[in-house]
Structures are given as structure tokens and as C-alpha cells.
């Protein structure tokens, strides 16, 4: 199994073949990065296996929870600020990270379309490079196995009106719950909406959530400058109070992206200070267009007041204030996009999580195929080199086979213990070739000499050709084995 180091600036991939054994995986105390000595098993149970995404203030990893019956996947988010931030900015960023954990604990376990919180913890570790102690913060949440809607549009193009209407309806139901708890999400956008393998829609990334405590769902404090360019309404960009209607505005812009595949900058007419999204080629029913137009109005009080009201209109009701006029205007979206957290899984391509992850499934999913094949090629060539040397020095079959067997066992053991990796194998093969070049007697196996004579090649060139053939044979064998293993795994997970 390969484990990623989460220390900023390291990110080394560490291989531990013994962790493919389920019993070892669940009983081992700790493993450390071979480069910086960072603990790899976070909080004693979470094993990072893949980087999902990285933003200005955090990184997200796909991880295994080794203390669950199915070895379930989860998302581990690390507070990882970058750039030149002053102490006030760092404190704000950390408070937002902690707030996401609090919100997920409060909301996730109560709504099945919001990820659950599994853990939140600090980690104090020594840095051998500086001699100082570093502190890191981690948040562990449910892994949603799917694709965010931004990537869906990038890959497949705009959605149909029926699909967009479904997304809008599902999101309104989720926001009705969120707003009902007194929270405002403040970062609704396509990359924070994810559809899983079964088609269920989820709302992600609660790092920008703000509690609404005054007025009609309004915050009694100013809003921090945290938003995504093009999706935030004027009141949010100005740092003013935020409302449920703030999220509804961002949801409307999200719907425009899903319908057209175009960004807000492409659909907003800055010269006339209005949205210009209704193109002749875009077929959208008048009722849906009217709902979107009203949600895009610049003043919060002119939009729908709640998600429930929008749902009522979509279901045939009239709402409280009638329809918004076509071509509704709004202030030019300006400001800086300060994205606090990466979307947990939006940066990753859809993964097919096994139904019952275990020793075999994890070995298959986490196997670095190219590295295995390359190391197999180096091993195959090394075995040919040493086989020729053994037979050349000891023509007696039993002795040469014994020596070759010991060499094979030694190489396998050294690779298992990670004493010999790609770099070391390259060095070993290079030194072997130099030895063959310096000592001709090491390559005087009669069959090699005979083959060199037939090919009219120097003996050393013939030896290298034989080594290449051995490398190809090993690579082909490994590739066939991996193919069979993956096919077998695919069949078993569908039973």
C-alpha cells in the first residue's frame, strides 16, 4: 500500500507492501515518511492514499479508515495556509476551518445530502529539517464517490432544462434545511455540488458558512470577503449582511452555468449593468426563466425570501411577489475570489469505490502500476545479467542455479524491505554492465558467445539484448497478472 505524506512541501509517496495485509494494516502502531519522518497514519486510523485537491488554505486527501469493518474511504482535509498571510488572516482562515467542522457535525448527521463529519483534530510533529515542532489541523469527513457539476459540464456539455430543474429543486430542499438551522452557506457554485454514482446530489464545502441571527435570516455582523467570483451577489461582495437570498442568488448563477456552459463573466453585460443570458438558441421555459431572473435581482428583498418560496413557485404556486422582469439587472460582479477550502472530492475524477474494501481491493486500487512495471523491467534485466555471470563463473548447473536462486531471493527481499527501489535498481544494473565491460570473463557463457557469433554482435551487446528481452518478459508477465487481477476484482465487486 502507498501512503502519502501530508507535510507541506514533502508529499512523498511511501510504499509499504506489508500493509496490504488486513491484519497488519489494522494492528500496526504507526508508519513514518521515509523522507521527513512525518506520521503517515493520522490520528492513529486514517491513511492518506491520494491527493484530491489543493487550495490556498488547505489540501484534501482520499484516505482509508482502517478501524471500520469495510475499510471505508473518507476525505481528510488539512489546514495548510500558503502565501504571505499576517497573523490576523491566519487566525481567520483557521477559524473558518474549525467552523466547517462544527457545521458538518451539526448538519451532516441530520441530512443525507450533506457529508458527515468523522473527526477533527490537531497534530503536533517534530520537523527534523528545522528542529522545531509544527502543528497541523485535520478535518475528516464522508467521501462522496462521484463528480461535481462543474466537471460534468466540462466533460459532457450543458445540462438539459429538465436536469437543471432537478438540480435546482434538490438544492432548494437542501438549502431549506441549512437555512432552517440559521446558517448561510455563502459559497454555492457548480464545483460544490456533487452527484454520486447513484445519482444523489450533495452540497459540499461548508468552510464559508455564516450563522444568520438577525432580521429575516440576516447576520448581525458584516460578511468577511470570502466568496467565489461571479457567483456572489452584491451584498456579499460588499462585505455586508448575508441572507438566505444570498445563497439563492448564487444558486441561480449556478443554474445559468449548467444551462449554458458559460461563466458569469460571459453572461453578464457590464456595459449595460445587467444579465444577458437569454440567447435565441437556448430553450428554457418561461416559468423557469422567470424564477432565475428574479433570483438574480441585485437587492435581497426583491428576490424570493426563502428556498421554500422558490419551491412553491416551481411546483405551480405564485410565491409572494409575482415574477421578476426579464433582463433583471445587477451590480457588476467585482472583487477577489478568496477560496478558503478545496472542494473535498471535486478535483478528483469519479472513483469506483469497492463495496467491500479489504486487502485485495486496496492493493488493486492503490497499486502504482507504472512504477511496478518499470521496477519489474529493471528486475528482469538484473536477473538476466546475474544469471549469465553465474553460469559463466560456474559452468556446473547445480552451482550456477544455486547462486542465481540466492541472487533472486536477495533482490526480492531487498525490494520487499524497500532497500532496492527504482533508483537503486538502476544503479545496480549500471554497475553490473560496467563489471561485465571490465571483466570479459563474466560473460563467457558458451551459449551467449555462440549467440553473439551468430548475430555478429559483440558479446556485451548480446548480453544487454538478452537483458532487455528478460525485462520485456517480466513486464509482460506482470501486466498480464495485473489485468487478470483487476478483471477478477471487477467481477467480484459486482456479485
From Swiss-Prot:
Q: Which Gene3D superfamilies match?
A: Phosphorylase Kinase, domain 1 (3.30.200.20), Transferase(Phosphotransferase) domain 1 (1.10.510.10)
Pfam families under this entry? Pkinase (PF00069)
Give the Protein kinase domain ranges: 46-314
Residues annotated as binding ATP? 52-60, 77
Q: Which SUPFAM superfamilies match?
A: Protein kinase-like (PK-like) (SSF56112)
Q: Does the keyword Hydrolase apply?
A: no
Q: Active site: which residues?
A: 187
Q: Which cysteines are joined by disulfide bonds?
A: none
Enumerate the catalysed reactions: L-seryl-[protein] + ATP = O-phospho-L-seryl-[protein] + ADP + H(+); L-threonyl-[protein] + ATP = O-phospho-L-threonyl-[protein] + ADP + H(+)
UniProt keywords (A-Z) are: ATP-binding, Kinase, Nucleotide-binding, Serine/threonine-protein kinase, Transferase
One GO MF term on file is: protein serine/threonine kinase activity
- What is the enzyme's class at the highest EC level? transferase
Compositional bias (Polar residues) spans? 329-350
List, alphabetically, the GO terms of the cellular component aspect: cytoplasm
Annotated transmembrane regions: none
The ranges of region (Disordered) come to 316-354
EC number(s): the record gives: 2.7.11.1
Instruction: Spell out the family assignment given in the record's similarity comment.
Output: Belongs to the protein kinase superfamily. Ser/Thr protein kinase family.
In Swiss-Prot or TrEMBL terms, this protein is called Serine/threonine-protein kinase F
Q: Which organism is it from?
A: Synechocystis sp. (strain ATCC 27184 / PCC 6803 / Kazusa)
Q: Which gene encodes it?
A: spkF
